[in-house]
């Protein structure tokens, strides 16, 4: 029998500890009873596996009353109260210490939680302090106590608890930029009318993204196709300006001025999104979708924008000393299709440009139109931010709608934890069902809370087009009913789970067992989807700081190789980072999991230094197109040393310290190093979690 301690750890049930505690209560009351009487009382405690310490203590109080020792029961209650008070004081001191460390610029788990936030800066400090206060309020006043206990133990992780106390706040989204630009919007109480040029439309788009990012806590996605009509508007303007010239001269000048505006606009997009800051102290977590065929009416204009956004990203930006660096944002997604994947196809030149961009800047990420159409009812659309995908949904006219939709949040499951505490595989599946049911109920509660909130909490989202155009003062629920938004059940450590049940994950047998578990989760999630009429879906949790938390939670169990012998656990369904496998095999192995992970999934392959080898990237893209819906290519060759000008991989030790391999520079303010932390690129110089450091340092190249 095991007892669950208050910190979540399991330890063998020790009856003698209880005897000693009860004996102290008797002595405090000057009762001189024999040890046999005390043992008799303790022997009547009903103990089961994984019993909570509080349940044991509740039974002791009742038994002391049943045995007619009310004074001793009172003393025992007082004993519990004193210990609870001491724990509360300790918790309060811990909270105060965390706040003090944040505002004094010290490093802790909170400051290292997000690799894209510089916790040394005032605006980030303020956001982190506010976040810690909101976490405390949410946990004490709002959160389901059973789920909170599971969260604290590390069985699950309730993401973004620093925002959940604010009812109505939502996660990631596909911003309906088309509606806002074509029909106007309102920002900070000021009407922004339809722009009359691409240049103005792009500037407004960046302002919209910053405003939306400040009204939610997840990533935002837009598409270049929504800017494409303004390319035509600008072209028509230049044609009017030069209408009195000869046709040839007019064409030359129109093309010249139009290209200049396209170039300036895409540069504006890049610079604005990297220089503007949302209310949480960071650049908007923005994704830009590059799909040639999104709007066939404006395909020529869309192609021009896609080409230029790649060219601008290849140029990069400059760091403080003038060195060219790779900005972490915006994330780019490029769609591979039948007319751009093979040499000789109509748009293959754009794919070659995308490959060059990947070689130098680690973006874009890639969606296969062929595979996505199989999974998403013939549709092609981007993730919301990093990897969260919507389900197909039709409006009242029977038309598919994706832009203007959103996700309400994620709660993730630590799969290897459930496996390690289970008696066998069937017991594991039962525990998994139980956890999925609890999370589903909580997500339904969150959905209902959001539905009952007034739209004025975020006018740009609900009143002025980003998500909806509801009347001011109405309830959000009008916009998100009938499964309009998604709610995510995350999971991590599928590989460790499979290893625990005696199968090597990277094999065919491991793939089969992994897919069996995935399908089981998928089916159970769909049961709850129907039960609550809520668009619940499985989400491959990326984990940044959570990987450390989940790994630490596994340490209480006997150590098993490939399961709980590291400081991190593997993201979602991925093959472990240290597992030796070639990139093509990795893509083929992981591809089937994305169908079941319908609420969010992305795979990656680790590339060597590919700065001068776009052909290698093009070969990988063909494999992605034929096999996998969504994939990214990682490289470590985008780093820069400001001291000596070195470009390549900056080394990182197991404590997160950085060092230039060329000149030996270790001052993190003189180094620019970035890695794929989860789905987004993260800046190592901002600090990252212990588990993610170990994960990064253990990654093997797949080519």
Please tell me what each predicted stretch does.
Residues 262-266, 270, 500, 688, ...:
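Metallocofactor- and cofactor-centric catalytic cores in central/energy metabolism, strongly enriched
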Residues 662-703:
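Long insertion/accessory domains within large nucleic-acid-processing enzymes
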Residues 22, 227-231, 494-498, 674:
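Buried hydrophobic packing segments
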Residues 14, 655, 679-680:
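Conformational switch/transducer regions in large eukaryotic molecular machines and scaffolds
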Residues 92-484, 504-673:
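Conserved catalytic cores of very large enzyme subunits
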Residues 487-500, 519, 676:
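Contiguous, well-ordered alpha-helical segments that form the cores/surfaces of helical PPI scaffolds
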Residues 1-105, 694-700:
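Charged, amphipathic alpha-helical regulatory modules used
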């Amino acid at each position: 029998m095991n007892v669950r301690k208050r910190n979540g750890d399991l330890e063998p049930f020790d009856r003698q500890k209880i005897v000693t505690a009860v004996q102290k209560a008797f002595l405090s009351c000057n009762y001189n009873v024999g040890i046999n009487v005390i043992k008799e009382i303790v022997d009547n405690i009903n103990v089961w596996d994984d019993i909570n310490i509080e349940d044991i203590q509740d039974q002791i109080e009742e038994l002391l009353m049943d045995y007619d020792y009310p004074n001793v029961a009172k003393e025992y209650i007082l004993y519990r109260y004193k210990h609870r008070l001491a724990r509360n004081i300790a918790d309060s001191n811990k909270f105060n210490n965390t706040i003090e460390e944040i505002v004094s610029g010290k490093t802790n788990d909170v400051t290292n939680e997000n690799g894209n936030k510089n916790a040394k800066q005032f605006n980030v400090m303020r956001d982190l302090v506010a976040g810690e206060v909101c976490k405390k309020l949410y946990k004490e006043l709002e959160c389901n106590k059973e789920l909170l206990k599971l969260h604290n133990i590390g069985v699950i992780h309730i993401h973004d608890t620093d925002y959940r106390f604010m009812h109505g706040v939502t996660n990631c989204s596909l911003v309906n930029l088309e509606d806002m630009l074509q029909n106007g919007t309102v920002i900070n109480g000021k009407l922004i009318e339809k722009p009359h040029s691409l240049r103005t439309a792009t500037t407004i788009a960046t302002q919209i993204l910053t405003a939306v990012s400040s009204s939610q806590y997840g990533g935002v996605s837009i598409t270049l196709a929504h800017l494409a009509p303004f390319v035509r508007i600008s072209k028509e303007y230049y044609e009017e300006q030069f209408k009195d010239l000869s046709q040839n001269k007019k064409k030359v000048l129109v093309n010249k001025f139009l290209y200049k505006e396209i170039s300036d606009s895409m540069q504006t997009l890049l610079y604005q999104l990297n220089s503007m800051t949302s209310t949480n102290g960071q650049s908007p977590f923005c994704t830009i979708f590059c799909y040639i065929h999104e709007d066939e009416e404006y395909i020529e204009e869309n192609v021009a924008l896609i080409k230029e956004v790649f060219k601008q990203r290849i140029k990069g930006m400059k760091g403080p000393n003038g060195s060219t660096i790779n900005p972490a944002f915006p994330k780019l997604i490029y769609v591979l299709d039948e007319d751009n994947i093979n040499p000789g196809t109509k748009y293959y030149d754009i794919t070659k440009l995308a490959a060059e961009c990947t070689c130098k800047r680690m973006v874009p990420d890639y969606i296969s139109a062929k595979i996505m159409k199989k999974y998403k009812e013939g549709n092609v659309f981007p993730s919301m931010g990093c990897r969260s995908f919507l389900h197909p949904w039709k409006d009242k006219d029977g038309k598919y709608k994706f832009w203007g939709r959103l996700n309400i949040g994620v709660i993730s499951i630590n799969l290897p934890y459930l496996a390690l505490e289970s008696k066998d595989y069937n017991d594991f599946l039962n525990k998994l069902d139980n956890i999925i049911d609890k999370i589903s109920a909580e997500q339904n509660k969150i959905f209902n809370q959001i539905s009952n909130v007034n739209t004025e909490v975020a006018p740009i989202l609900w009143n002025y087009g980003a998500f909806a155009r509801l009347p001011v003062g109405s309830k959000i629920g009008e916009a998100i009913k009938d499964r309009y938004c998604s709610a995510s059940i995350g999971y991590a450590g599928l590989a460790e789970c499979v290893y625990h049940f005696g199968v090597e994950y990277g094999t065919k047998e491991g793939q089969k067992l992994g897919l069996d578990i995935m399908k089981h989760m998928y089916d159970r999630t769909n049961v709850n989807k129907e039960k609550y009429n809520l668009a619940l879906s499985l989400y491959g949790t990326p984990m940044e700081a959570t990987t450390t938390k989940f790994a630490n939670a596994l340490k209480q169990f006997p150590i098993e190789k490939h399961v709980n012998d590291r400081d991190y656990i593997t993201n979602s369904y991925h093959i472990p980072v240290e597992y030796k496998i070639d990139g093509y095999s990795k893509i083929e192995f992981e591809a089937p999991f994305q169908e079941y992970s319908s609420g969010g999934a992305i795979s990656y392959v680790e590339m060597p230094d590919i700065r001068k080898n776009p052909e290698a990237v093009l070969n990988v893209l063909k494999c992605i197109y034929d096999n996998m819906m969504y994939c990214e290519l990682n490289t470590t060759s985008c780093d820069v040393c400001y001291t000596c000008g070195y470009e390549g991989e900056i080394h990182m030790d197991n404590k997160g310290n950085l060092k230039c391999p060329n000149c030996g520079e270790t001052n993190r303010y003189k180094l620019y190093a970035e890695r794929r932390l989860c789905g987004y690129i993260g800046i190592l110089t901002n600090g990252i979690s212990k588990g993610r450091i170990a994960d990064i340092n253990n990654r093997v190249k797949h080519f």
